[in-house]
Every structure is written in C-alpha cells, then in structure tokens.
Amino acid sequence: SILSHGKSARLYQSLVYEQKTALAVGADYGLMQADPGLFYFYAVVKPGEKVEAVEDAVLKEIQRIQTEPPSELELQRAKNQIEAAHIFEQDSNFRQAMLLGEAETIGAGWRKVSQFVERTRAVTAQDVQRAASHYLAADMRTTGTLIPQPPQTQAASPAQPH
C-alpha cells in the first residue's frame, strides 16, 4: 500500500503526477499462500514515453523503500487501507467462510484470520524496510514487457454464409 494502491502511493505520485511518464502504476501479491509467491509491479507507459525510463523509475522507488523507511503518515495510511480491505472482505457469511477455509488450506490456521488486524497494526516502518530489502532484492527479479502490436489490416472479403 505504501508503494501502490491509491493516488497517494509512492509509485503513483512519482510516475503519474511528478514525472508524468505513466498513466497507471501499481503492485500486488497474493496474501493467502503458504509458500513464497509472486509480488509484481506494473505500469502503463504514457504514449511517447520510453518503457526503460518507467522501469528505471519503478526500480528507484523499490530501492528507496529499501533504504528509506516510510513516514509515519505513509505507514498509518497503509495500515488503514489494509485493515479496511480485510474488514470489507468479510462482508458476508460466505466470504468469512472462504477466508477461514483458505487459511486452513494453506496451513496458516483459521485463528490467523482473527489476528490479522492486530498483527497489521504492529508492523513498524523498519519492518517494511526490512521486508522490502529481503523480498524485493535485485537478484530475485524477473522483468517482462508487453508491447502492443500495430493492428493488422485485413483485406476485404466477401461475406461468408453461415
């Protein structure tokens, strides 16, 4: 949430508002998994801008969170977003059951669900910095670039009966 999720996040502020090189930017990961999983970043490069420049800017923000802990405001905003999402995720008996079932399935145990808010509130700026340094390390990255192809023109063909 500090790097992504919202217009006040570091990536959005940097790439969309300040540098104006991206139309959208963010990050996400799967929280409910037993083993290490995918944490990914994405950006929609503004027409006319270089993909490499946007990638470099994303990497600079990753490096920044590894070397500069989030401010208290950033940390509290992230905690509020995470807590609200967790509460809204349980807005029905079905969703509560799914969440408890997922926790059991991955071996975390259903009790972890009830401890989630408390554990989130206990996270410190140094915890965020330490996790970013460990999990977002340069030697653990894979980069992919999706480049749209120009539309192909089709020769006019007579209508085919069905």
Model-predicted regions and their roles:
Residues 6-7, 30-89, 159-162:
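M16/insulysin-pitrilysin zinc metalloprotease superfamily fold
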Residues 10-25, 34-36, 68-114, 118:
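Short acidic/His-enriched helical or mixed secondary-structure segments at domain edges of catalytic enzymes
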Residues 15, 41, 58, 82, ...:
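Buried hydrophobic packing residues in well-ordered domains
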Residues 24-29, 128-130:
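Glycine-rich, charged/polar anion/phosphate-binding loops
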Residues 26-28, 40-44, 142-146:
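Soluble periplasmic/extracytoplasmic beta-strand elements of cell-envelope proteins
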Residues 115-162:
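Proteolytic maturation boundary segments
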